[in-house]
Every structure is written in structure tokens, then in C-alpha cells.
Amino acid sequence: MRINKNWVIVALICAGLVVLVGRSSSTMKSAEAKEAESGLAAGFSTYEQAFTKAKADNKLILLDFYTDWCGWCKRMDRDVYSDASVQAELGKYFTAAKVNAEATVSHTYLGEQRTEQQIARHLGITGYPTLIFMTPDGQVVEKIPGYVQASEFTMVLRFIGTGAYKTQEYQSWKKTQS
């Protein structure tokens, strides 16, 4: 009878640990989602808001894939997205969202629930920052890996935003913009 009592105590302790770990995990996931939302740069929406706004306003989408440890991503936030000309072009043509390529926050992507990590993997993103331009229905228009200076980024935003990308190469178009 003594052995059975010990097994009951062990089972209760294990059950308690399972419940504790489960609660901790769900708390971490909701904290991660809140952090993702509160850490948005000025002018950026959440992933879902970006697609909703893009459809409603008939604008393109800019997804900025980043990681928390990426120095160039932080520099992009600090030096590029704060630039007035970048903000003007973004507001005119795009809805933008930041996507943490290592996060486990889930979104609907191509009709399926996927984490930000899975979305980044599906889009072939291996370096950060990487900028993905999309139509409101999720079709990729352009993929730009790496840091882009504000003056160049303003031109890229105008090139894609005006639809010039449909008929011209960027370098040829850029020469006509002086």
C-alpha cells in the first residue's frame, strides 16, 4: 500500500508541472504577441491590419522581416523609417508591417495559419532585414534583402508604389527621375 501512495504523490507532482508549463507557455506566446504589437515602428501596422488596410485602401503591402538581434534592422528603423521622405512615400502607396522572422506568433498566410518564422521560411528569407513588397492579395511583387539607405529606399518605394516596376527595370527608371 505504501508504494501506491508514493506513485499517487509522484503523479500529482507531474500533473502539476504539466499544468504549470502549459500556462507558462501560453503566457509567453501572448506576451510575444503583445510585444510584437507594441514594438511597431511609427507608421507600421500589425500583419493582419496591413492586409486589411491594403485591401480597403487598394495599396501595396511592405513587410519588413527582421530579428531582434539584427543590427542593420535596428539601423533601418532608426535611420530609414524615421526619414520624412520615406514616411511620405510609405504613406502614399503602402501599408507596412514588421515581421519578426524568429517569432512564433501566428497569422493567416495564403489561407493557412503560419508563424512569422514559417512565413519567412516560405518566402526564402535567410538574411535580415529583408523587405517584401506584396499586392493586397499576397502576391510577391519584389524582394529586397539587406539594408537600404533612406535616399535609395525613397526611390524604391516610388518605383514600386507607382507601378513602374510592371514595365521598367529599376536602374533605367531611376535615370529618368533626376
Where are these regions (language model features)?
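N-terminal targeting signals for export/organelle localization
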Residues: 1-40, 178
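A short beta-strand-turn-helix
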Residues: 43-60, 90
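Short active-site neighborhood of thiol/selenol oxidoreductases, capturing the structured segment around
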Residues: 56-71, 96
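Active-site-proximal beta-strand/loop segments in catalytic clefts of secreted hydrolases
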Residues: 65-66, 99-102, 134-136, 146-147
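Typically the conserved alpha-helix immediately C-terminal to a functionally engaged Cys/Sec
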Residues: 72-91
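Non-catalytic, surface beta->alpha helical segment in thiol-disulfide oxidoreductase systems
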Residues: 79-81, 121-166
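Structural alpha/beta surface segment adjacent to cysteine/selenocysteine redox centers
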Residues: 89, 93, 99-126
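Flexible coil segments in periplasmic/lumen-exposed cytochrome c-class electron-transfer proteins
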Residues: 164-178
